[in-house]
Amino acid sequence: MSDNANREGRRAIVLLSGGLDSMVSGGIAREQGFALAALTIDYNQRHRVELEAAKRVAAALGVDRHVTLPLNLRAFGGSSLTDDIDVPKDGVMPGIPSTYVPARNTIFLSLALGFAEATGARDIFLGVNALDYSGYPDCRPEFIAAFQHLADLATKMGVEGQGFTIHAPLQHMTKADIAQEAARLGLDAGMSWSCYDPTPDGKHCGLCDSCRLRSKGFADAGLADPTVYA
């Protein structure tokens, strides 16, 4: 029996931001036979337009339960996405940029883990990537492996031997690979959102790290970019 057959109908939680990476991660989970629930975090981010994109993507993926959880990380600040700090637009630079949100993926994965255990799901998918990315420390394979260990230690299901699997299927893909994977899965990349600093009329700015990586990914993949840039 194939792995997909074994997974048929088994529930997975998809951390869904509304971005291209999380959409493709969810598409891979669906292709593998999982029944999908999605968790989107409304953390009072600058680019709140991604929350509407998450709704569109969830519907396209056939998610049967989509929870949008409010969590005001602007109360902490410390990031261009949650504070009055300009979003860098000088290209992808070495080091960790100001768009890094302190401990964001640790927080989000912890919430997804709680959602998973509460609903009996044992699989969590997220779209982190450690190749074409902005250098965030919580996107690295070492972080995912460490959180996997934490999940098994810190939960009732984990200590009872049922365990969880943290899936990061895009971990070692380039942005071009991800764009091609979206096309292969039949996903409409145009419904996703990547920009950190949207224009007042609802366009991608075209200059932030996330826009640059997205645009380059489609170009390198030889695919038409459906994104509307300013």
From Swiss-Prot:
Listed pathway(s): Purine metabolism; 7-cyano-7-deazaguanine biosynthesis
GO biological process, any: queuosine biosynthetic process
Residues noted as binding ATP in the record, renumbered to the chain: L16, S17, G18, G19, L20, D21, S22, M23, V24, S25, G26
Cofactors that this protein relies on: Zn(2+)
Residues binding Zn(2+), per UniProt: C195, C205, C208, C211
InterPro entries: QueC, Rossmann-like_a/b/a_fold
Alphabetized CDD domains for the sequence: QueC-like
Cofactor note: Binds 1 zinc ion per subunit.
Gene Ontology molecular functions: ATP binding; ligase activity, forming carbon-nitrogen bonds; zinc ion binding
Entry's EC annotation: 6.3.4.20
Catalytic activity, as annotated: 7-carboxy-7-deazaguanine + NH4(+) + ATP = 7-cyano-7-deazaguanine + ADP + phosphate + H2O + H(+)
Source domain of life: Bacteria
Top EC class for this record: ligase
Keyword field: ATP-binding, Ligase, Metal-binding, Nucleotide-binding, Queuosine biosynthesis, Zinc
Similarity comment text for this entry: Belongs to the QueC family.
Function recorded in the entry: Catalyzes the ATP-dependent conversion of 7-carboxy-7-deazaguanine (CDG) to 7-cyano-7-deazaguanine (preQ(0)).
Name of the featured protein: 7-cyano-7-deazaguanine synthase
Origin species: Rhizorhabdus wittichii (strain DSM 6014 / CCUG 31198 / JCM 15750 / NBRC 105917 / EY 4224 / RW1)
